[in-house]
Amino acid sequence: MQESQSKKMNEAKTNRGLHFFKIVLRPPYRLWLILLRYLHKSYNRVLLAYNGVLLAYNRALQLILIPKTPIASCVLHGRPEVHSLVCHRHMYNYILAIKSFLRFYNDVTVIVHDDGSLTKKDKRTIKKHVENINIIDRDYADEKIDKIFYHYPNCRRYRDECVNALQLFDYMLLSESDKIVSLDSDILFFKKPETLIDWLRDGTEIIHFWEQEPAGTREFLAKINLDDCFVPVNIGLLCFYKETMNLDLLEQILSKVEIFDWCTGQQIYSILLKKQIERHELSFFEPSQYQDQTEFRDGGDEQIARHYWSSVGTLDEYLPDRKKIIKELLNASKVDKI
């Protein structure tokens, strides 16, 4: 019995020794592969932990600090309208975005389009933070637009399939104002946006966020033989007009599109804006001042607004800027109370 156990122990030692020599004698590239695998796993663990910290920090900002920022206000009806499509997940992002603008200029009517995910509590929270804001419920919008789309089946198909189609149709079809601003919920204003305010007061052109090569736009236009309608537009911030809507043209375009995606609306805006060129000059916000995520620049005093593309994840840039805006809003509130 003892001899058997002793024999097994000797064999185990021999196997460990052989295993050691096998590792030493392996080709160097295999050792590198093992090392890289180990480092990759470690990196992923660190990255997950880092993202977890960022998300926790983001949630803390939402639940603790943003609710403490001072109430903003706007005009209930009759002014140029600032339209935003807002979801439950980005509700606090939107509140901070619109407050960052209204602190500089509030002679506007503000419209929130419910994407269908806003809860009753979300709507109460938004109304609490922005006096006189208008919220268009998804059910109400669907009913109104459905009647308009009676003779436009492809427009209805697109709106039913893609939630952000509301940015294309509802902003214009449900607007009471001739002047419309499309504002995404992941934009922050750092300084008084003079170009935007001048347009709201008496501008006559169309002004858009500059994006040099919007995703898929050239390919989309080529497929429907409208290459000459390319505009380097990002609709995250866009100043335009209710008359831009052309349902007959949209029905014709959408009949040629089999599969819609998140970029379809922006691609179609390129066409609509180009068709307006005889009535309104096409212009764009200075990219160094109004920075789209593809054009972010470090520091400096130039930046007036930033668009973060939060849907694809730019927390590294967004969270520090967000904290800065919150701090400025809170400090302004303290000054007002003195």
Describe the predicted segments one by one:
Residues 163, 167-213:
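GT-A fold catalytic core of metal-dependent nucleotide-sugar glycosyltransferases
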Residues 105, 130, 175, 276-277:
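A structural signal for short coil/turn segments at secondary-structure junctions
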Residues 212-214, 230-312:
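Catalytic core and acceptor-binding pocket of nucleotide-sugar-dependent glycosyltransferases
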Residues 3, 7-147, 308-338:
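N-terminal anchoring/stem segment of glycosyltransferases
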Residues 207-229, 322:
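A short, conserved beta-to-alpha structural element at the edge of catalytic cores
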Residues 83-94, 160-164, 227-231, 258-265:
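Aromatic-acidic/polar surface patches that form glycan- and anion
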Residues 128-174:
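Active-site-proximal specificity loops/subdomain of glycosyltransferases
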Residues 89-90, 117-118, 141-143, 187-189, ...:
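Short, solvent-exposed loop/turn segments at secondary-structure junctions
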